[in-house]
Amino acid sequence: MADNESSEKKRKKLSRRKFLVRGGFGTLGVLAVGTYLFRNPIRRTILKKVNSMDIEYLGSTDNPMLWFELGKDNVVILHSPKVEMGQGTFTGIAQMAADELDVPFENVKVVHATTDTGNIDQFSTGGSTSISGLWQPLRELAATFREMMKIEAANKLGVSISQLSVKDGVVSANGESLTYVEISEGVTDWTIPKKPILKDISSYRFVGKPLPRVDLADKVYGAPMFGLDAEMPNMLYGAVVRPSKIGAKFISATTDKAEKMPGVVKVVSEDDFVGVVAESYIEAENAKQAIEVVWETPDNLQQDEIVAMMTVGNGTSSIIQKQGAALEGDDVVQMEFRSPIGAHAQIEPNGVVAYVEASKATIMISTQVVGITRKEVSSRLGWDVEEVNVIPTYLGGGFGRRLHTPHAVQAAVMSKAVGKPVKYIFSREEEFQHDMFRPPTHHILKGSLNEKGLLSGLEHHFVSGDVGNNSALLPNVVPTILGADVGAIRGAFIQYTGVPNHRSVYWHVDLPFATSWWRSLGLLANTFAIESFVDEMALKAGKNAIEFRLAHVNDDEAGKRLKEVMSTAGEKAGYSEEVKNGRAMGFAASVDAGTPCAHVVEVSVEDNNIRVHKVTVVLDPGLAVNPDQIRAQCEGCVIMGMSAVLFEQMKVVDGSLTPTIYGPYEMALMKHAPREIDVVLLQGKDTPGAVGEPPLGPIGAAIANAVKRLTGKRLQSMPLKLT
């Protein structure tokens, strides 16, 4: 029913200035403040705002026709600007839309918005912002759509709007009824009300219910829905030659042998890459191996050099949080912690199909940044963005990996060279060796106790490589303005603001390999360090770990929510600091993107291996749009966090990142999963909050704290190993 021409015009009216104003993202909104940003107190205020991830939806919210269309049987098709990567966003937004549209939940069909036919988010899908960011605009759009139906129904039925009632997508008055589809027939000029009236949340039928996933059947039956499934008629296959050494620069390539191999259509040589296009995937991969490339490589790096590089005191520093005086004196306790390089290791490797025609390019891809993918392809082709249509697919795991899509550009270049669609799939080796890794970190924690056994001071000094810096999501000026990487500082703030003297100091080091976004960003490593140290201070003070923490949390709104999460976790888990039957409990808590979370774990040691038996998760996500999906996210965070904390690490060996395949890259297996994950949800506010990443934060420290009580050993480096 949407008027595509008028919709496109309305989308183009969203000027750059309006985009920045609507964005609400502190990083963008502060640009007008100018030189005041370079004053440290203001910087720290902005960093705190950015760290809360209070990001509004960055896209058009004034035209329901970009979002909704009507299908047969009165089905409403919702074009989602957020991609589905297993987090359940499609289900949550279907619930939100159904309530305000006043249609049955099963009558809402959610599809990915393409850049040609729907509204797209100019930011990304990530940062735990999909449901929280769409909560207000999507409901308003749905309410507007409902009111548009009522206006036209009143015209067709010859009654006033006040005489109408709406139920299940049917508008009625005086014994006559019209479905939304019947109302829309023949209407070309819609009246869009300026201010929709939202329903009272208490009247919602679907929000707050544990409804089944809308994509469940497709996944069970194996529908072709992922990037690797994407196909186009007459499709060829591409492969790209990549260096095995860190920092290698392309010099030249000899392609004669590859050009003569079976199935090869063309070898595409560019200044920045060499690719092969062939009739099959295997033929493209085989020909790639036959290309002789000359690389300029630096001296072979080794792991110990990376460790030395990633040490507090190296690089540039910025104070991101400061209250009171710095810690000095003989009574100051100091400990160090480290986390390793981490891979995304998502199940589905990156894949893309690109078809570049004379004046139109079509890209089918697993991407978390639909708009950025479009801009990068159009820029490389030298075209206007309107000439590139990006069709996002379902993602077989995102975790931040698909915030980078240079392979879309490479596939487009290869397609243009051969005049046919080209499918480019990463091999597993490519996926591991050329990942955008989670950077390694080093932390120094300092603390002191007063005569009452309470913290008089707490400091966190840490170093990290790039997370948000140098990514397409953030303008290059942002690091200069903020003085810190907005991703690296996630979880780095001292949440125990009742400590009179506390500070957090960030150090940045440029690493020789690519690092970037990884699920929860800096939260996992920062929480591991801070919460392990706080637990050590509780032991030193001779106090219960939970009670010790509660004594240092303020009673503002955020503090009260954190306290409630901590207390509830202890109660639900039956937290005890006694070792019973060879098992011990550990506790940790964190606040991420405004969502507090606490874990209590129960562990044992079997053959010098740490075994996690039970995890109790207490999360306060605010209003739970779909409680079952939130529990699933908590369970997923526990398993992913356990895997990272107990097993995963990449290393630099002779100038290369290794390993490059599952198996040697250790990950948690089914046998390592806890027998029980108990999730308790609280509601400390009346709107949805972040969910996809906050539950990942506490797991590492909780395990380490349990191991300390069980064995007496303080494990200070991930992955946690007793030998």
Model-derived features with residue positions:
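Cofactor-binding beta-sheet edge motifs in enzyme active sites
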Residues: 2-723
